[in-house]
Amino acid sequence: LSDYDEEEDERAKATLDAR
């Protein structure tokens, strides 16, 4: 669960950065 949450957070950050 922790790993998944961390990965999701990183992906969300990348998406925001791309925007």
From Swiss-Prot:
Modification after translation: Conversion of fibrinogen to fibrin is triggered by thrombin, which cleaves fibrinopeptides A and B from alpha and beta chains, and thus exposes the N-terminal polymerization sites responsible for the formation of the soft clot.
UniProt key word Transmembrane helix: no
First-listed, main subcellular location of the protein, grouped into a coarse class: secreted
GO cellular component terms attached to this protein's record: extracellular region
Record key words, sorted: Adaptive immunity, Blood coagulation, Coiled coil, Disulfide bond, Hemostasis, Immunity, Innate immunity, Secreted, Sulfation
Origin: domain of life: Eukaryota
Gene Ontology biological process terms from the UniProt entry: adaptive immune response; blood coagulation; innate immune response
Modified residues (Sulfotyrosine): 4
Keyword set includes Endoplasmic reticulum: no
Protein location: Secreted
Function: Cleaved by the protease thrombin to yield monomers which, together with fibrinogen alpha (FGA) and fibrinogen gamma (FGG), polymerize to form an insoluble fibrin matrix. Fibrin has a major function in hemostasis as one of the primary components of blood clots. In addition, functions during the early stages of wound repair to stabilize the lesion and guide cell migration during re-epithelialization. Was originally thought to be essential for platelet aggregation, based on in vitro studies using anticoagulated blood.
Comment field on protein domains: A long coiled coil structure formed by 3 polypeptide chains connects the central nodule to the C-terminal domains (distal nodules). The long C-terminal ends of the alpha chains fold back, contributing a fourth strand to the coiled coil structure.
Subunit structure: Heterohexamer; disulfide linked. Contains 2 sets of 3 non-identical chains (alpha, beta and gamma). The 2 heterotrimers are in head to head conformation with the N-termini in a small central domain.
Protein name in the entry: Fibrinogen beta chain
Native source species: Tapirus terrestris (Lowland tapir)
Lineage per the UniProt record: Eukaryota, Metazoa, Chordata, Craniata, Vertebrata
